[in-house]
UniProtKB/Swiss-Prot annotation:
SUPFAM superfamilies: Ribonuclease H-like. The gene is CAF1-7. Component of the CCR4-NOT complex, at least composed of CRR4 and CAF1 proteins. Keywords: Cytoplasm, Exonuclease, Hydrolase, Metal-binding, Nuclease, Nucleus, RNA-binding, Transcription, Transcription regulation. Belongs to the CAF1 family. This is Probable CCR4-associated factor 1 homolog 7. InterPro entries: CNOT7/CNOT8/Pop2 (IPR039637), RNase_CAF1 (IPR006941), RNaseH-like_sf (IPR012337), RNaseH_sf (IPR036397). GO terms for cellular component: CCR4-NOT complex; cytoplasm; nucleus. It comes from the Eukaryota. Transmembrane segments: none annotated.
Amino acid sequence: MSLFLKDDSIQIREVWNDNLESEMALIREVVDDFPFVAMDTEFPGIVCRPVGTFKTNTEYHYETLKTNVNILKMIQLGLTFSDEKGNLPTCGTDNKYCIWQFNFREFDLESDIYATDSIELLRQSGIDFVKNNEFGIDSKRFAELLMSSGIVLNENVHWVTFHSGYDFGYLLKLLTCQNLPETQTGFFEMISVYFPRVYDIKHLMKFCNSLHGGLNKLAELLDVERVGICHQAGSDSLLTSCTFRKLQENFFIGSMEKYSGVLYGLGVENGQIVH
C-alpha cells in the first residue's frame, strides 16, 4: 500500500452508540495483523493552569494535564491500524482502507466548561455537538469494550501518537473511570500497564536532524498528504500513522524499542527520565 493515499481509497468509519459493538468486533479481528495503532483525540481545549511552585517543567506540565483532563470530557477518538509496513486493513464490500472515528456523547456545550477557541475550531471542522449528545457513544460502554478488544494491555500492540500526553490522559480516565494519578510516576505506571509500547512522534523528532513543528508541518516536510478533515480525530490519526511510517523510513534503522515509553513534554528533564 502506498503512503500516498487518496480520499476515495479511505473509509473513515464513523462510530456512534448504535454501531459501537459491531465496529469493535471488526477491530478485534484486525488488531493481530495490524498491531500499530495511531491515535488522536479531540477534547474541549485547556481551560485552567495550576498555580504554585513546581520542581521541574514536566511536573508543571503534568499538573496542567491532570487538572484539565479531570474536569473535561473527550469529544472524539480516532484510531488507525497498520502493519509494520504501513498497510491498513480493508473492510466492507468495496475493500476500502478503514480507519475509525468514535463520537462520544458526554460533552455538553450547554453545561460543560470548555475553551471557546478550541470548540469553535472543532465546530468549523464539522463536529456536530448536538448530534454527539443525541447519538454519541456512552463512554463507560466503550471502556468495557476497549478493555476486551485486544488493543490495550497488550505488549504486541504499538501505540503511535503525536504530542500525546492529553490523548493518553483522556483514554486512561475513560478506561479506569477515575481521575488521573496525582503524580507523573503514577501516570507513567498506568501508561506502561495499559499501553506497554508507545511512540510519540514529537519525541522522535528530536533524533531527526532537529525536525520541529506540529503534525501538519511535519507531514508537509515529509510529503505526507492528509486524507479527510483537519481537527477531526480520524483524519488526524491517519496522518499520524503515515507520518510515523515516513519518519521511520527516513531516519531510523532497525528496532525503535529504545524510543518507546516517552511522551513529549512529560517525564524527561535535561535528557534524564524523571518518572
